[in-house]
């Protein structure tokens, strides 16, 4: 089996996925460890407002992660469909050239 430059090795993909999940877990853990009281004292805001701000930041991070995953899957899927379509058209034209001849296919 020949490899092309565009192939992604499965172990590299799973390694990157594992690193991503580890970073997400560490980020979530660090947000939980931030003391709300210190945040409130530093900026002079009530503790309830500080808790809401932290929850919004954490939710924003989750939304960003989900959008990034969907974008990656979508762009990879579209390029795969485009490549399959290109190969299908190429094969169809080769078959038509064999049946009708090159000049007939060009005139068609």
UniProtKB/Swiss-Prot annotation:
Positions of the pro-segment in this chain: 1-38
Pfam families, sorted: Bacteriocin_IId
Cross-link (Cyclopeptide (Leu-Trp)): 39-108
GO biological process: defense response to bacterium; killing of cells of another organism
Reported modifications of this chain: The cross-link permits a high resistance to proteolysis. Is more resistant to specific proteases than to unspecific proteases.
Superkingdom as given in the UniProt entry: Bacteria
Keywords: Antibiotic, Antimicrobial, Bacteriocin, Secreted
Entry's localization field: Secreted
Gene Ontology cellular component terms for the protein in this record: extracellular region
Known role: Cyclopeptide antibiotic that inhibits both Gram-positive and Gram-negative bacteria. Shows potent to weak activities against M.flavus (MIC=3 ug/ml), B.cereus (MIC=12 ug/ml), B.pumilus (MIC=12 ug/ml), E.coli (MIC=12 ug/ml), and S.pneumoniae (MIC=47 ug/ml). May act by forming pores.
Descriptive protein name: Pumilarin
Organism expressing this protein natively: Bacillus safensis
């Amino acid at each position: 089996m020949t490899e092309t430059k565009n192939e992604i090795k499965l172990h590299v993909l799973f390694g990157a996925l594992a690193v991503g999940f580890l970073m997400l877990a560490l980020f979530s853990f660090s947000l939980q460890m931030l003391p709300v009281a210190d945040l409130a004292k530093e900026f002079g805001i009530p503790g309830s407002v500080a808790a809401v701000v932290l929850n919004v930041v954490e939710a924003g991070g989750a939304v960003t992660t989900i959008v990034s995953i969907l974008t990656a899957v979508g762009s990879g899927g579209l390029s795969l469909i485009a490549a399959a379509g290109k190969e299908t058209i190429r094969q169809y034209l080769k078959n038509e050239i064999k049946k009708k001849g090159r000049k007939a296919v060009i005139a068609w």
